[in-house]
Amino acid sequence: MRSILILLSLLLTIAFASASFPYQCGPYSCQFGQVCRIDNGVSNCIPINDCHEVSLSTKVVGTWVDGSRGNKRFTQYDITITNNLNTNIKQIYIATDYTLRLRDHSNNSIWNVNLLPNGILTLPSYQPSINAHASFTFGLIIEGTQPANLNVLSVSF
């Protein structure tokens, strides 16, 4: 009985200590509608509307009907990630959903960005960061004319 009380006290102490320090968030740990913001190793989940450090903009490059693909309509987009900070963005994770209907799963349908198996987009190895007040653009071709839903999951600076 005494050892159970000691164990419970120890677990309660650990729980209290863990709750009083900022926890390390990542691209998978924040709730829907939140962004994991990591500033010099200190991380927290914030509402997506409060994340002014980075912005995504979508521009239509062109739309066409492809007869060789069953007369399907495709649209090419440029997606620009803009760093609004006075410091470099070290890493960014961008969420996608069912609206990212790539023309095919090749480098001809998405470029200048890494598409992970789980559908998350990250910076390519040749672009390890985005400089202060700079932008980085990647492109994609999707089926239809509706742009893909893209949301920042995590940003580290």
Swiss-Prot record:
Subcellular location: Secreted
Main location: secreted
Gene Ontology CC annotation, any one: extracellular region
Keyword annotations of the record: Developmental protein, Differentiation, Secreted, Signal, Sporulation
Key word Signal present: yes
GO BP terms in the entry: cell differentiation; extracellular matrix organization; sporulation resulting in formation of a cellular spore
InterPro entries xref list: CBM2/CBM3_carb-bd_dom_sf, CBM2_carb-bd_dom_sf, CBM_49, Dd_Spore_Germination_Stalk
Position of the signal peptide: 1-19
A Gene Ontology molecular function term of the record: hydrolase activity, hydrolyzing O-glycosyl compounds
Database matches in SMART domains: CBM49 (SM01063)
PANTHER family given in the database record: CARBOHYDRATE BINDING DOMAIN-CONTAINING PROTEIN-RELATED, CELLULOSE-BINDING DOMAIN-CONTAINING PROTEIN-RELATED
Protein name (Swiss-Prot/TrEMBL): Stalk-specific protein B
Organism, scientific name: Dictyostelium discoideum (Social amoeba)
